Amino acid sequence: MGKKKICWITGDAFMDTDQNVVPYLMKYSGMQIDWYQLSDFNSKVPVHPDVTCVFKFKNRGLNPLRILEYIKLFNAIGIRKYDIIYSGFMDVSYFFFVLKFFAGKIFIVHAAHNVIPYSVWSKRLRWYVNTVFKYNHHFQLFSKFTADYFRKKYPTKSMFYAPMAVKSFGEVVTDNYKVDSSKLNLLFFGNVVENKRLDLLIDAIKGLPQEIQNRIHLNICGNCKDAERFIRQIDGCSSISTYFKRIDDCEIAELFTKHDFLMLPYEDVAQSGPHMIAYYYNLPVIASDIEGFAERVIDGENGYLFKRNNLHDLVAVIKKASQLDNVESVSYTHLRAHETSLH
């Protein structure tokens, strides 16, 4: 009997999740895995060296011509020669329907990164996600609380829970961001969207007593479509610096090793990519107490939790962190060991 053949599809948005997992499975699973990376025409996400083939789209996601591109893709890779299709790609238009048609009776395992709708989701995205859950039958969930939610809402579906792995971006190879090592350095990292509550974090920093503000610094690093709004909110506060841009992958290790805490003030999340990067680089977090964080953060051991959307509580936690005699009193050296225990 030959090896099982797996077609593994990863979109740019989930490349940071799969880039450490798929090469490991290729080496140790005993299965033949062909890995396909799907990229937008203007993507800056690098191609992983273990990827079998990269497919760059010429049209935007809602353009009906995307249907023809999906047809071309599935014909080119011979989708029906596989035993299992693992889909780590998400659009809000045609992908699932074309994949379902071409796959026929082949198992499609959908990587369900988000199950419970975020407050910032559009109606189209809500409809599309619900459609995938309704018509597909096999799913992977990445956090315990979303797995429990999924089991209750979709009791007839087949699912398995495999926690999101810690994420490595290699060794430090850049020196582009200057930090004052005499201060407590805080990092907000990733695309800035409404549910991540950067506004709350900025208010918290500005609300600290001046003598504490003088001893801390927040760097905000990531793409932002509404940068001017946050620059106005910061209003010249010298304890906050902004880098509103796409952070190159080669710079990520530098950022996560130069700071003392990763800030995760989100109001809702299933799981967080930056959170898993932080744990790889032994960087503790200050996070809201939503379930997506509470199942991984042990308060005072690998980070601190504060009450969701509570400015007063966030200020208090930042004050607590600023008063540590030795930042390493939060057990950095055990962060990856703690994550390993969850897997």
Cite the ranges covered by each PLM segment.
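Donor nucleotide-sugar binding/catalytic pocket of nucleotide-sugar-dependent glycosyltransferases
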Residues: 136-172
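Short hydrophobic beta-strand element within catalytic cores of glycosyltransferases
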Residues: 284-287
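Conserved small/polar residues in nucleotide/adenosyl-binding loops
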Residues: 333-342
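Short His-centered aromatic/hydrophobic patch
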Residues: 87-94, 112-115
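Nucleotide-activated donor-binding/catalytic signature segment of Leloir-type glycosyltransferases, i.e.
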Residues: 230-250
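Glycosyltransferase donor-sugar binding loop
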Residues: 38-41, 189, 216-229, 245
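Conserved acidic donor-binding segment of nucleotide-sugar-dependent glycosyltransferases
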Residues: 299-300, 304-311, 318-326
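Conserved donor-binding/catalytic core segment of Leloir-type glycosyltransferases
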Residues: 178-196, 202-205, 219
